[in-house]
Amino acid sequence: MAHKFYRNYQPNNLIANSKVAKVAPLAGAALSMVGPNPLKKAPIPPLAYKVLATLEIELPNLGFCKLSVCMTDLMTSNGYTINHKAVPDNAPKIQSFHAGMSFLSSPRLLFIWLAINASYTKKYVPHP
């Protein structure tokens, strides 16, 4: 005869406080207070709700790697809050180091880059 734990084994019972039904209604209630009529369903979400509901995070261009834009969408339905991340249709193309060096188009950054390379050359390259 199997032990009682194995017979009634469900993975959700092992994870404490992770059920959506417990957490999501609180988040839905908090988001419903954003509108002009708190705790009332508005026919059209106000501007503040639209700003809070959709966040667009753009990571900076680091020179040799361009990071894509990540769209985070926060939706509420029947007290359940779901966090969606939009996945791009096409995979980002792999760029070489030289293809991503568009930051050198600024004269000030170009000067700094040349100064760093010149000091490196002076320090580490032996003179004949």
From Swiss-Prot:
Partially overlaps YMC1. This is Putative uncharacterized protein YPR059C. It comes from Saccharomyces cerevisiae (strain ATCC 204508 / S288c) (Baker's yeast).
